[in-house]
Regions:
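Secreted/extracellular ectodomain signature
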Residues: 1-133
């Protein structure tokens, strides 16, 4: 889970804090609607998005886990949920992951906390959610 320096969401920061709630429809790279606007996408309710976050920037569909870093979009990450602020690739550090194929926010964003190999920071199989407003 060692990530390059950049705009990643780290410890003490929620995903919501990086976006404004203005703007129109949010869509995936394949143009499928995620929510009618930023407010709906970023809010804790409703509990479902219109579609899942299961499409990569290249248009590939995925079902594997994705690094999330916190329990919800509105919850700030901690060093224990973000692989030490995404700076650790050690098997003794952990990060929270979600399931991008789910449109249920609680499952998509952080379905798993500390669960052995699934969330150990040396796991190179997980992708990272990337949102652009």
């Amino acid at each position: 889970a060692l990530l390059p320096t950049g705009p990643a969401i780290g410890a003490g920061t929620s995903a919501v804090s990086r976006f404004t709630t203005s703007g129109g429809v949010w869509v995936r790279p394949d143009n499928v609607q995620l929510a009618i606007n930023a407010t709906q996408f970023l809010a804790t309710t409703p509990t479902l998005w219109d579609s899942s976050l299961s499409v990569t920037a290249n248009g590939n569909y995925i079902t594997t886990r994705t690094w999330a870093g916190a329990a919800t979009l509105t919850t700030a990450g901690a060093s224990t949920t973000t692989c030490n602020n995404w700076a650790s690739a050690a098997s003794t550090s952990y990060g929270w992951v979600g399931l991008p194929a789910s449109s249920r926010k609680s499952t998509a964003f952080a379905n798993y906390a500390t669960m052995g190999g699934i969330t150990q920071c040396d796991n190179t199989q997980h992708r990272v959610y990337c949102l652009q407003q």
